[in-house]
């Protein structure tokens, strides 16, 4: 059993509500300046997140299982052993709809091609971001969505 004093609370929140909320021993994510791992008694932090995967190592009662969440940017705030990730969108691996993510990937690729043909840098950037989001969702689902 995990020592109760060594547990942190991890929540992922979007405009649609709470996507994830569990006790854990560790949370790891990609911030815009690189990988970050937070454990019990980490210094307080607020940092922006990149599009990527959040990994949450659950407590010993949960057999140290690791949950995977696709996060499309946002922020993490950590203090008093509570980590809160606020994102525009986030999905647990098991909840990602592969067909929807594949459709989003195809649309983004088409938009990139159209933007390239029009030499429209803004549309190109928007399409690249949409593509990264779709690829992230597919990666998390295909590798961890059991």
Swiss-Prot record:
Pfam families: ATP-synt_DE, ATP-synt_DE_N. GO terms for cellular component: plasma membrane; proton-transporting ATP synthase complex. It is found in: Cell membrane. Keywords: ATP synthesis, Cell membrane, CF(1), Hydrogen ion transport, Ion transport, Membrane, Transport. Residues 102-122 are annotated as: Disordered. The keyword Ion transport applies. SUPFAM superfamilies: Epsilon subunit of F1F0-ATP synthase C-terminal domain, Epsilon subunit of F1F0-ATP synthase N-terminal domain. It is a peripheral membrane protein. GO terms for molecular function: ATP binding; proton-transporting ATP synthase activity, rotational mechanism. Produces ATP from ADP in the presence of a proton gradient across the membrane. F-type ATPases have 2 components, CF(1) - the catalytic core - and CF(0) - the membrane proton channel. CF(1) has five subunits: alpha(3), beta(3), gamma(1), delta(1), epsilon(1). CF(0) has three main subunits: a, b and c. PANTHER family: ATP SYNTHASE DELTA/EPSILON CHAIN (PTHR13822), ATP SYNTHASE EPSILON CHAIN, CHLOROPLASTIC (PTHR13822:SF10). This is ATP synthase epsilon chain. It comes from Lactobacillus gasseri (strain ATCC 33323 / DSM 20243 / BCRC 14619 / CIP 102991 / JCM 1131 / KCTC 3163 / NCIMB 11718 / NCTC 13722 / AM63). The lineage of its organism: Bacteria, Bacillati, Bacillota, Bacilli, Lactobacillales. The gene is atpC.
């Amino acid at each position: 059993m995990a020592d109760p004093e060594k547990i942190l609370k991890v929540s992922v929140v979007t405009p649609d509500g709470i996507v994830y909320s569990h006790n854990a021993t560790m949370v790891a994510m990609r911030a815009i300046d690189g990988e970050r791992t937070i454990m019990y008694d980490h210094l307080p932090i607020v940092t922006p997140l990149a599009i990527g995967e959040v990994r949450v190592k659950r407590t010993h009662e949960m057999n140290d299982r690791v949950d995977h969440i696709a996060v499309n940017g946002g922020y993490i705030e950590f203090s008093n052993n509570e980590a809160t990730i606020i994102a525009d969108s986030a999905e647990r691996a098991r909840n990602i709809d592969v067909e929807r993510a594949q459709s989003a990937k195809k649309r983004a690729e088409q938009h990139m091609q159209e933007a390239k043909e029009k030499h429209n840098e803004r549309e190109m950037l928007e399409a690249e971001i949409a593509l990264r989001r779709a690829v992230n969702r597919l990666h998390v689902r295909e590798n961890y969505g059991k």
